[in-house]
Amino acid sequence: MDPMSLTLPTPRTPDPMSAPPLRWGVLGPGGIATALVTTLHANTRQRLVAVGSRSQERAEQFAARFGAERAYSSYEQLVADPEVDIIYVATPHSEHLANALLAIGAGKHLLIEKAFTRNAGEARQVRDAEGAA
């Protein structure tokens, strides 16, 4: 059989609207969080339910803008919310380790984008904490 005559199957791309909706919490309501939530709302059935910030005012503004039900003035309050399934960490990368460990300790799933942590050692700490949870 000639390998050039093989027909490859059409790739299947999952429909993002078919994914089960998760209840998201945003930790750090800044520009990158705005981009993520805008994309989630436009392309999926995911729900933003809570926002945590060091500033109650910023949390409330972000929550109002994107329809979140709750706004918290601390990250601890956000991760303690039983109605949040997954935390999007949108703080400066120098804070990612502490934020990730806080969320993992509360039993939450995480999404952390680049830079994941400041270095490989911190990344291993997050991996190890998640593995132990």
Question: What feature does the model see in each segment?
Answer:
Residues A63, R127-E130:
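Conserved hydrophobic residues forming the short capping helix/wall of the S-adenosyl-L-methionine
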Residues D2-F66:
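N-terminal Rossmann-like dinucleotide-binding module
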Residues L40, A103, E130:
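Short hydrophobic alpha-helical segments of the AMP-binding
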Residues E69-R127:
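Beta-loop-alpha module in the N-terminal Rossmann-like domain of NAD(P)-dependent dehydrogenases
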Residues G107, A132-A133:
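Glycine-centered short loops/turns at secondary-structure junctions
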